[in-house]
Amino acid sequence: MTTDDLAFDKRHIWHPYTSMTSPLPVYPVERAEGCELVLASGKRLIEGMSSWWAAIHGYNHPQLNAAMKAQIDAMSHVMFGGITHQPAVNLCRKLVAITPEPLECVFLADSGSVSVEVAMKMALQYWQARGESRQRFLTFRHGYHGDTFGAMSVCDPDNSMHSLWKGYLPENLFAPAPQSRMDGEWDESDIAPFARLMAAHRHEIAAVILEPIVQGAGGMRIYHPQWLRRIRNMCDREGILLIADEIATGFGRTGKLFACEHAGIAPDILCLGKALTGGTMTLSATLTTRQVAETISNGEAGCFMHGPTFMGNPLACAVACANLTLLESGEWRQQVASIESQLRAELAPAQSSPWVADVRVLGAIGVVETTHPVNMAALQRFFVGQGVWIRPFGKLIYLMPPYIIRPDQLRRLTQAVNDAVHNETFFSH
């Protein structure tokens, strides 16, 4: 990549959550292999983000590459309206087999945010078909569900990336974020505000939507499984649907194939994305029960009113099937358990820094929450200098490495985090 290319990028290309007047620096990557990104300079960076939590098997995995190459020769895309194909059937068969019962109807879409939009539309259309006007969603503060309009309406309205849009979005119901931690005791009083909100608005609520066990980009909080059990019971009692957004947590990230398994519950609607294709292509899936699907289909519209152009893309479905085949081997369980053990041991020293508020770990997730926002540009430059790729935001420095990472590579990541949090120059104060 030339200097001219980088100048063009800076002038014309809008990167995620980046200013066009004072953009953060970008680092040109030429290729990626295993757990490493190779910069144009030849410098290698150990990958700590799994490309926003998606590349669970690392990069250039031979089985995933082979699946894509074979599918390209047959058919890279075809519309899904009035047509079906083997990769979609194979993928949906696998998804129905591995997700909790009674989820059995699958809607394929483009991205995680769209999966959430689809789930919300399913819930709204379900109640419309039943002749009830339920138009609101109940969720937690500090939640994050995506950047599209409906998804933004169930993100924290005050403490998130979407507070700018308050007043424009539909007004949903927000309970305080869970305080009972995964590694602590369950406090029954923790759920009281949530229960009061549900009781007060039970005839308005179409669904509860939440990120099970781990709240992702809204704060990386890890909460007690009893929350999910109690909410499942409340939803059953009130006849309210439960949507589990497992876009970040699905496919083994928390040590269980799906985070709902920590509580032994099943949602009425399940959102999947990110790691669905092993981080190779964009694809998402929204699963629901036969009862929800048939209620929608028997309503006035006679069908579910959604249909993306690239729905069921054969290339994405083929590589997603290969990804699930890799997961079926079960090797990921030991990999994630080993990562968790190493993260717990090696991030513990960060707690001694005066700039650190909390350290938390679950599965292949390690989070260091700081007392002050980090200086993003300076800290990113430091990490690249250390030969690691870690992308912090706000007060969070976190690791979500590929499951195939070696202990020595993970040690480089944790050492870089420990060095950073003991250096006050990286914090705004």
From Swiss-Prot:
Matching PROSITE patterns: AA_TRANSFER_CLASS_3 (PS00600)
Site feature (Participates in the substrate recognition with KAPA and in a stacking interaction with the adenine ring of SAM) residues: Y17
EC assignment: 2.6.1.62
Catalytic activities: (8S)-8-amino-7-oxononanoate + S-adenosyl-L-methionine = S-adenosyl-4-methylsulfanyl-2-oxobutanoate + (7R,8S)-7,8-diammoniononanoate
Gene3D superfamilies, per the entry: Aspartate Aminotransferase, domain 1, Type I PLP-dependent aspartate aminotransferase-like (Major domain)
GO cellular component: cytoplasm
Localization terms from the record: Cytoplasm
Pathway the protein acts in: Cofactor biosynthesis; biotin biosynthesis; 7,8-diaminononanoate from 8-amino-7-oxononanoate (SAM route): step 1/1
Modified residues (N6-(pyridoxal phosphate)lysine): K274
One BP annotation, GO: biotin biosynthetic process
UniProt KW keywords: Aminotransferase, Biotin biosynthesis, Cytoplasm, Pyridoxal phosphate, S-adenosyl-L-methionine, Transferase
Coiled-coil stretches noted in the UniProt entry, renumbered to this chain: none
Summary of the function given for this chain in its UniProt record: Catalyzes the transfer of the alpha-amino group from S-adenosyl-L-methionine (SAM) to 7-keto-8-aminopelargonic acid (KAPA) to form 7,8-diaminopelargonic acid (DAPA). It is the only aminotransferase known to utilize SAM as an amino donor.
Protein's recorded name: Adenosylmethionine-8-amino-7-oxononanoate aminotransferase
Native source organism of the sequence: Salmonella typhimurium (strain LT2 / SGSC1412 / ATCC 700720)
Gene: bioA
